[in-house]
């Protein structure tokens, strides 16, 4: 139940503000994630033909793959507004109620890190997601009474890097569940090319390829690297990004040919050198490299595992033969 006096939306919701934002606004402009894009196109078109709100959508996968961008696209395609918040910000039932009661029909509510919602907030979400209703408490003590408030039909888009941490009752209320995968190099080249054009940058195919290869399959990283390579090119190469310029800039940034940064290399080399290739438990590994276990699980490991440099086993993490080859090291034993 929600106390009516606690409905204050100001500090917990932000209208989407596309200031100097070149991210795609429509599905037709969305690069990559072909299966997700085609499925969402059908689901959105069907909902619009019926005049309904789109079913609630759960997006999961490693960080930086476009979950927020896709939420904005859904709002645009449904001709509604996007309201954004995150799981940790929603601390009280009144926080969520304030957001929901300010929505318009077919608006999209985007909750990032939805796996971090408190049980109290989840309980409020259930009737809102299923019946578009809220339970509100009016008054106090013996005179208090509960009323149900109808809210407009809306779409909840939840994003998470840890789908296993979402409770089953919440997960089961999402009609559409989509996993975002790491991007192939070609798709990243197209994303970088479009961003470079928007920024009026001069970049060759070789420059595009070099940045894309080192971007860990992640658009967010690709665009961050593009901005840093742009800085390097403006200072040392008259603003033109060629293969050699991109290579020199990325080497200076300590991003190697596999896309590894300092932390990636440290993680693998600690397993190889200190733990003889593994297996090593997550807690020991976190202590050895001075990182939180959540950072290792959510940020570092997914790409290393997907690319075949690291294995998770019941006994712990193991550096693969591919990791040894990358560092030109000899395995002390078979893996």
From Swiss-Prot:
Relate the protein's function as given in its record: The RuvA-RuvB-RuvC complex processes Holliday junction (HJ) DNA during genetic recombination and DNA repair, while the RuvA-RuvB complex plays an important role in the rescue of blocked DNA replication forks via replication fork reversal (RFR). RuvA specifically binds to HJ cruciform DNA, conferring on it an open structure. The RuvB hexamer acts as an ATP-dependent pump, pulling dsDNA into and through the RuvAB complex. RuvB forms 2 homohexamers on either side of HJ DNA bound by 1 or 2 RuvA tetramers; 4 subunits per hexamer contact DNA at a time.
Phylogenetic placement of the source organism = Bacteria, Pseudomonadati, Pseudomonadota, Gammaproteobacteria, Candidatus Palibaumannia
Q: Give the species.
A: Baumannia cicadellinicola subsp. Homalodisca coagulata
Cellular localization per UniProt: Cytoplasm
Region annotated Small ATPAse domain (RuvB-S) sits at: 184-254
Q: Quick one: which residues bind Mg(2+)? A: 68
Family affiliation: Belongs to the RuvB family.
By its UniProt entry, which Gene3D superfamilies does this protein fall under?
A: 1.10.8.60, P-loop containing nucleotide triphosphate hydrolases, Winged helix-like DNA-binding domain superfamily/Winged helix DNA-binding domain
Q: Where is this region: Head domain (RuvB-H)?
A: 257-335
Any idea which positions bind ATP? 23, 64, 67-69, 130-132, 173, 183, 220
Q: What is this protein called?
A: Holliday junction branch migration complex subunit RuvB
The GO cellular component terms are: cytoplasm; Holliday junction resolvase complex
Catalytic activity entry = ATP + H2O = ADP + phosphate + H(+)
> Which proteins does it associate with, and in what oligomeric form?
Homohexamer. Forms an RuvA(8)-RuvB(12)-Holliday junction (HJ) complex. HJ DNA is sandwiched between 2 RuvA tetramers; dsDNA enters through RuvA and exits via RuvB. An RuvB hexamer assembles on each DNA strand where it exits the tetramer. Each RuvB hexamer is contacted by two RuvA subunits (via domain III) on 2 adjacent RuvB subunits; this complex drives branch migration. In the full resolvosome a probable DNA-RuvA(4)-RuvB(12)-RuvC(2) complex forms which resolves the HJ.
**GO function terms (MF aspect):** ATP binding; ATP hydrolysis activity; four-way junction DNA binding; four-way junction helicase activity
What EC number(s) would the UniProt record show?
3.6.4.-
Renumbered residue ranges of the record's region Large ATPase domain (RuvB-L): 4-183
Q: Which PANTHER family match?
A: HOLLIDAY JUNCTION BRANCH MIGRATION COMPLEX SUBUNIT RUVB, PTHR42848
Per UniProt, which keywords does this protein have? ATP-binding, Cytoplasm, DNA damage, DNA recombination, DNA repair, DNA-binding, Hydrolase, Nucleotide-binding
